[in-house]
Amino acid sequence: MFNMQWIFENQSALWSALVSAGATGVAIGWWVKQRYQLKTQLLEQQLEQQSHWHAQQIQQLNEQLTTAQQELDELDALRDKNEFELKQSHGKLMAVLEKLRYFEAVKQERQQYADELNQVRAAKAELESQLREQEARHQQQLVASQEKLQLLERAEERLKQQFEHLANQVFEHKTATVDVQNRQSLEGLLTPLKEQLEGFKKQVNDSFNHEAKERHTLVHELRNLQRLNEQMAKEAVNLTQALKGDNKQQGNWGEVVLARVLAESGLREGHEYQTQVSLQNEAGKRYQPDVIVHLPQNKQVVIDSKMALVAYERYFHAETDSERDSALREHLLALRNHIRGLGQKDYHQLKGIQSLDYVLMFIPVEPAFQVAIQADPSLVNDAMEQNIILVSPTTLLVALRTIDNLWRNERQNQNAQLIAERASKLYDKLRLFVEDMEGLGGALDKANQSYQGAMNKLVTGRGNAIRQAESFKQLGVEIKRSIPQPLIERAQQAPDQENAPLVERHPIEDKVN
């Protein structure tokens, strides 16, 4: 309360003091502000100077850095150049080393060739020497042969003269008796000829009778053949009409022709080829190709028979060019349709076979195939673009014969491999047998040595066992059967030294030797 009262009493004085203090503070603040601005200007000038100095320093450093970078780049380029030159030098050095090794090998090979050349020259000199010796011997033999030939010619001349003289004598001696001998010889020749003529006459008569009978039989057979021919003609007409109108029968007839070609190819059904095999593709659709021909190395090729006879029959019997051209176009169209349908089957993607990339499309009628190829050669290429090869009975037979030869070669190779394996096994067996025989021979040798030692102990030496046993007989020992006399004699005649060799050989030793 006292303080508040004092404040109220001195209020005006306090306000005056405060106003004076405020003016003083404003003056002080202005002075401080001016001083601060001056210091700030000084600091800014110093900072600007330092910044300018630092910029100069940085520029100098950048210039130095640029110079150093250029020097460093030059050093890198020089280093790369030196490395490249070093690699080139290393490559050249390796090439030189390789050439040195090659030259060394060539030198060794040259030395080897030189040695072989020396050997060949030595052999040549030896052969030339032998040739000269043979030529000398041949010349001597030739001279001797010429001398022998001259002797033979002179002997031949003498024999010729003697033969002429002897022939004259024989001619004079035989002239008197030649007539009698001629008559006898003529009778000897004519009598068998007469008998042969009579026999021939009899054979002619028999043959005439036999031919008459056969002629009658032949007439009968010709009539039967005529009836059979008429029947076959009717059946051929019926078959042609049936084939024209029934696609199933056409297909069956094509399969029959295909079966004949397969039979003539040498391949065996059930071994090298199969017919009417049911297969399915990845989608589960089932297909039944006509024939699957197996190739070596577990490969297969599919043959599908396609019959196109209707248009070809019209082409064959056409009377005008327009009819023939129209039928030919239909025939080509039918073949192309068959090719297109066969290409869509994708036989090479069927499960269960590893087929080749192409299928053989079999055309049973050879003329129909030839007419189509001659009229449109592009038909073959179009078919091959769809992995189809067109074949006729002739070309298919050639292909199948080739496959048969492949199988023959494969079987020969298999047989050769089997023979080699069996030969190897036989050689092993023979080696084991020889080893056993060697062991048996060693055992027999040991047994023979043991036998020789036992026999030496038995019959050699003054105190051998047989001599001592025989002395018991002199002492009155009763025996049931005597020792064989040859052993007793050998024991009595044996030398005094022990282990003397025997004169005779044991039968076992004879067998071993």
Curated annotation (Swiss-Prot):
Key words, A-Z: Coiled coil, DNA recombination
Segments for region (Disordered): 490-513
Keyword Coiled coil tagged: yes
Pfam families per record: RmuC
Coiled coil in keyword set: yes
Annotated coiled-coil segments of the chain: 36-250
InterPro entries cross-referenced by the UniProt entry: DNA_recombination_RmuC
Biological process per Gene Ontology, one example term: DNA recombination
Ranges that cross the membrane: none
Disulfide bonds: none
Basic and acidic residues compositional bias, start-end: 503-513
Highest rank taxon of the organism: Bacteria
PANTHER family recorded: DNA RECOMBINATION PROTEIN RMUC
Family per record: Belongs to the RmuC family.
Function: Involved in DNA recombination.
Name of this protein: DNA recombination protein RmuC homolog
UniProt source species: Vibrio cholerae serotype O1 (strain ATCC 39315 / El Tor Inaba N16961)
Gene field: rmuC
